[in-house]
From Swiss-Prot:
Species of provenance: Mus musculus (Mouse)
Chain segments annotated as transmembrane: 383-403
Organs and tissues of expression: Detected in multipolar cells in the brain subventricular zone (at protein level). Detected in embryonic brain neocortex, especially in the subventricular zone. Detected in multipolar cells in the brain subventricular zone. Detected in brain neocortex from young pups, especially in the somatosensory cortex. Expressed in developing limb and mammary gland.
Effect of a null allele: No visible phenotype. Mice are viable, appear healthy, and do not display any obvious behavorial defects. Cortical neurons from mutant mice display impaired axon growth cone collapse in response to Flrt2 and a tendency towards accelerated radial migration in the developing brain.
Chain ranges of the Death domain: 862-939
Topological domain ranges for the Extracellular compartment: 31-382
Classification via InterPro entries: DEATH-like_dom_sf, Death_dom, Ig-like_dom, Ig-like_dom_sf, Ig-like_fold, Ig_I-set, Ig_sub, Ig_sub2
Signal peptide: 1-30
Protein name (Swiss-Prot/TrEMBL): Netrin receptor UNC5D
Residue positions the entry lists as glycosylated: 115, 226, 351, 379
Keyword Membrane listed: yes
Keyword Oxidoreductase: no
Length: 956
């Protein structure tokens, strides 16, 4: 009974939809019939045996705020479609349906949709989400659609995990974590850097795909910034807290500087060296270098010992000139380690005949020689004993007549060293002191004196022509040389009895002066800072530095101050009775020598002339260059400009040639030439290791804007004339040198040059954007001899009260060397410490003529040439002299000269025009085995030049 009732109930429920469908269809038909509208047929053709097929099924949906959503279904063939939500049938009144015919198949298509509200979803409390599905009927049966879930969309406000700020070293890994807030549907994450979206597809170094995290594999300085995690879904967007990422650079030490000089002149002191934390400099809070920036060590300097006089000697025997004298020496003790020389006279002389001895209407006691050695006293005594006063008077009278006639017949200066008095108005500083025996190289073997010299001031003395000529003919300087050793103490031409440098001003002259010419050359002028420059019509018209001088048979030296360029005219290069106005110029305009291929100009273009002048012996031209010749990576050539303006190669520095000779020193090239013209040095790098030496310097000046300050960093060839052009430009712009220039080795490896400003004080100065680092292409630096190369930086003060500026200028070649210029200055001119452009000038005088232009006295030079020009069986000839003076190449050039030794000495004069290192020449002679005494051990204060005058007057 129960079973039958249950079956009946299930049967009733099974037929309930069909009954409802029937009554619904009947009511609908009646309604349409009552309205008179068209009634669709109850039986629509359908494919036999086909169940309803869903063309459109309901999709999952989200309710946003309070807006309802619509669920749709479409099926064919379908007589009716109903929605079932959460297992219950949706009421018929909530359905909206449409019917149509499928034109292709002729089947009936029915579409139904319902609305689901937020309230319906919230009121449902089931084990799963709110869901709905469609059920479609046909005469063959039913079909069900997929279940579509309906959820209320939301996005919570707070992130489950915000990204955290990081500080990482450069090239380190950065990982920023982000867990977005809970939401339906799940939020999508996007990363922002400084409010700009990050596209990981365009930057392979960044990955944002790993579980919403941001990963930067190798941190760069540009990766510093503020990072934000952005979460969004269909409801809202949420922003996380910003995370600051700082990529820092730890500082690194630069190389140590050289040790400084000892800070005391006497006793115990210290030396120091320093380094800077600039390799690299710390950035963005990076750690400063560990360790000390300055190191100090102790040092000891020898204390100076002042000299003291010994007791006076006995008075000498009365000489034929009615003079006797006594001497004392500064040897108790002698000055050492820079101590002061004894004050006072080293000798005293007086007339020993009560003024009765008369010479040429003047008492001889008015001629007061300043020094006489003990051996000279003994020799004077010998002369008095063996010669006799009567014979001396006769000899003097004969010599007076002979010398007077000789000098009147010659219009040029004599070639003897004593003739320099004609230029100095009677000032002489020659001195012989006979204290040692065995020096037959310089003096008469019978006399056997030593030669010592010093720098002293001598007043004008009255030397008569007869005595002068007697000294020329009888002086022991004309005896053959056997040994010599000389040491220079402090000044030009101190050793070997040659007077100090001085400039003699007078009227221009076209020829040399005869000995009898009475010109006003009695004043020795001080050093002149301005070169004497004379405009010549024959000089080129381009922009250039130039100087000129008049030279005769005695020769001389022409120097371009502060350029490193000089010209040496040897004694005898110009024939007697002739004199020439010789000029020298440096081209400062656009070089006329155009480089071919990899060839570069290494020196200035130097012109010397006149071009039609002929010389009897080669002259020496010194040209500065900027090549690093310490290693053999250059092929250097000497070139000359022809009259047609073209350049032709004279020789390669390493080649053998008999037409000219080139000696390459670290900073200059000394060339021996026979003809005047325009010359220059070019270089062709053999390898990428070839190095040009650049001089780097920084200048500064105020801008038109009172708050701005301009820095100009120059990189020019390391030649004095190139830097002098920079100085000239800066003087016109009002620039001031802020740091002493430094040397930078620039390789020929095609890598560019970088100039950057570092360590600018924050909150006081700022640099204009995008100018802190500037890069110069390799080609501009490698060929920078055309115009001075510089980089300009503009700094701005925050306030006008800022007057001090400190920063560092880093000049470095990529994959090469670098230099640091430390700027510490005041922008106020009244407080700024001036840095001189040149530590010392090249030469006091642009033109020096006669013996004063040479380091080696002419008489000594003659004896050296006479000795070494003679072939020697043991090989001790001019070739050995060349070898000992580091002249080992192209000796065939010297072999073609009439006096090889003279040309070697000319080259020595050109190389040592600055230091005057006569000791090196003396050492060379000693090594050859021709010297036995060392004159350089006799210190400068032990010698007085007046003794040389006295000995010459007495024929000693």
């Amino acid at each position: 009974m129960g079973t039958g009732a249950a079956d009946g109930s299930r049967g009733a429920r099974r037929w309930l939809p069909w009954l409802g469908l029937f009554f619904w269809a009947a009511g609908a038909a009646a309604a349409r019939g009552a309205d008179g509208s068209e009634i669709l047929p109850d039986s629509i053709p359908s494919a036999p045996g086909t169940l309803p097929h869903f063309i459109e099924e309901p999709e999952d949906a989200y309710i946003i705020k309070s807006n309802p959503i619509a669920l749709r279904c479409k099926a064919r063939p379908a007589m009716q479609i109903f929605f079932k939500c959460n297992g219950e049938w949706v009421h018929q009144n909530e359905h909206v349906s449409e019917e149509s015919l499928d034109e292709s198949s002729g089947l009936k298509v029915r579409e139904v949709f319902i609305n689901v509200t937020r309230q319906q979803v919230e009121d449902f409390h089931g084990p799963e989400d709110y869901w709905c599905q469609c059920v479609a009927w046909s005469h063959l049966g039913t079909s069900k659609s997929r279940k579509a879930s309906v959820r209320i969309a939301y996005l919570r406000k707070n992130f489950e995990q915000d990204p955290q700020g990081r500080e990482v070293p450069i090239e380190g890994m950065i990982v920023l974590h982000c867990r977005p807030p809970e939401g339906v549907p799940a939020a999508e994450v996007e990363w922002l850097k400084n409010e700009e979206p990050i596209d990981s597809e365009q930057d392979e170094n960044i990955d944002t795909r790993a579980d919403h995290n941001l990963i930067i594999r190798q941190a760069r300085l540009s990766d510093s910034g503020n990072y934000t995690c952005m979460a969004a879904n269909i409801v809202a967007k949420r922003r996380s807290l910003s995370a600051t990422v700082v990529v820092y650079v730890n500082g690194g030490w630069s190389s140590w500087t050289e040790w400084s000089a000892c800070n005391v002149r006497c006793g115990r002191g210290w030396q120091k060296r320093s380094r800077t934390c600039t390799n690299p400099a710390p950035l963005n809070g990076g750690a400063f270098c560990e360790g000390m920036s300055v190191q100090k060590i102790t040092c000891t300097a020898l204390c100076p010992v002042d000299g003291s006089w010994e007791v006076w000697s006995e008075w000498s025997v009365c000489s034929p000139e009615c003079e006797h004298l006594r001497i004392r020496e500064c040897t108790a003790p002698p000055p050492r380690n820079g101590g002061k020389f004894c004050e006072g006279l080293s000798q005293e002389s007086e007339n020993c005949t009560d003024g009765l001895c008369i010479l040429d209407k003047k008492p001889l006691h008015e001629i007061k020689p300043q020094r006489w050695s003990r051996r000279g006293i003994e020799n004077a005594s010998d002369i008095a004993l063996y010669s006799g006063l009567g014979a001396a008077v006769v000899a003097v009278a004969v010599l007076v007549i002979g010398v007077t006639l000789y000098r009147r017949s010659h219009s040029d200066y004599g070639v003897d060293v004593i003739d320099s008095s004609a230029l100095t108005g009677g000032f002489q500083t020659f001195n012989f002191k006979t204290v040692r025996q065995g020096n037959s190289l310089l003096l008469n073997p019978a006399m056997q004196p030593d030669l010592t010299v010093s720098r002293t001031y001598s007043g004008p003395i009255c030397l008569q022509d007869p005595l002068d000529k007697e000294l020329m003919t009888e002086s022991s300087l004309f005896n053959p040389l056997s040994d010599i050793k000389v040491k220079v103490q402090s000044s030009f031409m101190v050793s070997l009895g040659v007077s100090e440098r001085a400039e003699y001003h007078g009227k221009n002259h076209s020829g040399t002066f005869p000995h009898g010419n009475n010109r006003g050359f009695s004043t020795i002028h001080p050093r002149n800072k301005t070169p004497y420059i004379q405009n010549l019509s024959s000089l080129p018209t381009r922009t250039e530095l130039r100087t000129t001088g008049v030279f005769g048979h005695l020769g001389g030296r022409l120097v371009m101050p502060n350029t490193g360029v000089s010209l040496l005219i040897p004694h005898g290069a110009i024939p007697e009775e002739n004199s020439w106005e010789i000029y020298m110029s440096i081209n400062q305009g656009e070089p006329s020598l155009q480089s071919d291929g990899s060839e570069v100009l290494l020196s200035p273009e130097v012109t010397c002339g006149p071009p039609d002048m002929l010389v009897t012996t080669p002259f020496a031209l010194t040209i500065p260059h900027c090549a690093d010749v310490s290693s053999e990576h250059w092929n250097i050539h000497l070139k000359k400009r022809t009259q047609q303006g073209k350049w032709e190669e004279v020789m390669s520095v390493e080649d053998e040639s008999t037409s000219c000779y080139c000696l390459l020193d670290p900073f200059a090239c000394h060339v021996l030439l026979d003809s005047f013209g325009t010359y220059a040095l070019t270089g062709e790098p053999i390898t990428d290791c070839a190095v040009k030496q650049l001089k780097v310097a920084v200048f500064g000046c105020m801008s038109c804007n009172s708050l701005d300050y301009n820095l100009r960093v120059y990189c020019v060839d390391n030649t004095p004339c190139a830097f002098q052009e920079v100085i000239s430009d800066e003087r016109h712009q009002g620039g001031q040198l802020l740091e002493e220039p430094k040397l930078l080795h620039f390789k020929g490896n095609t890598f560019s040059l970088q100039v950057s400003v570092l360590d600018i004080p924050p909150f006081l100065w700022r640099i204009k954007p995008f100018t802190a680092c500037q890069e110069v292409p390799f080609s501009r630096v490698w060929s920078s001899n055309r115009q001075p190369l510089h980089c300009a930086f503009s700094l701005e003060r925050y306030t006008p009260t800022t007057t001090q500026l400190s920063c560092k200028i880093c000049i470095r070649q990529l994959k090469g060397h670098e230099q640091i210029l430390q700027v510490q200055t005041s922008i106020l001119e009244s407080e700024r410490e001036t840095i001189t452009f040149f530590a010392q000038e090249d030469s006091t005088f642009p033109a020096q003529t006669g013996p004063k232009a040479f380091k080696i006295p002419y008489s000594i030079r003659q004896r050296i040439c006479a000795t070494f020009d003679t072939p020697n069986a043991k090989g001790k000839d001019w070739q050995m002299l060349a070898q000992k003076n580091s002249i080992n190449r192209n000796l065939s050039y010297f072999a073609t000269q009439s006096s090889p030794s003279a040309v070697i000495l000319n080259l020595w004069e050109a190389r040592h025009q600055q230091d005057g290192d006569l000791d090196s020449l003396a050492c060379a002679l000693e090594e050859i085995g021709r010297t036995h005494t060392k004159l350089s051990n006799i210190t400068e204060p032990q010698i007085d030049d007046a003794d040389f005058n006295y000995s010459r007057q007495n024929g000693l």
